Amino acid sequence: MRGSFMKIYIVLGLLISLAIIFLMIYYIPSTDDLSPDNPFFNGLSTFVSRYNVSRISISDLDKIGVGTIVFLIGPDKNFDQYDAARVRDYLSRGGIFFIADDYGTSQELIDLLRINISLYRGVLRDPLLMYKNSYLPRVDVYIGRETLHLYMNYGTAIDISKTYEGSCIGYSSVLSFLEIYEGSNRTGRKVGGAVMYII
């Protein structure tokens, strides 16, 4: 009799433990970088809730209406001609397509769209104006009369030296630099002029 009660207690203990684990998984938010469910500094939950943002795939761009803004945030996939055609069609209908890239992953899409800029394959660092460490530099973005202080999460920079179009809206401090990845070596060499063009 006593052994059967022990089995019941063990089973109940396991069931309660599993219930607690599942509740913790359900209620603890995601901490993934750039996740729409992440409420921390490296997440997008405030952005998603404040601006009523919804997730879509590139194949759904033809369903998006005029007067919308699409953000491509932290891309991590290879792009092909199909993706570029969807983006090109969206842009031709008057859409705004904003690329927020880390490590220059979207260079392939930019090339397929025949835009004459290149993303540096490196990380913007700033030892002066930053959040917690130099890989999270502050960038001041000027839109109209408003200044936004953005903290880039392993951001990169744009090289527009081959084109005469475009303008810079975001600036890091004068002590910022690019850590360029060249094979397995990292270099802290200066690239380009004094202005950092930030995505």
Task: Describe the predicted segments one by one.
Residues 1-199:
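Short, surface-exposed patches at the edges or C-terminal ends of soluble domains, predominantly
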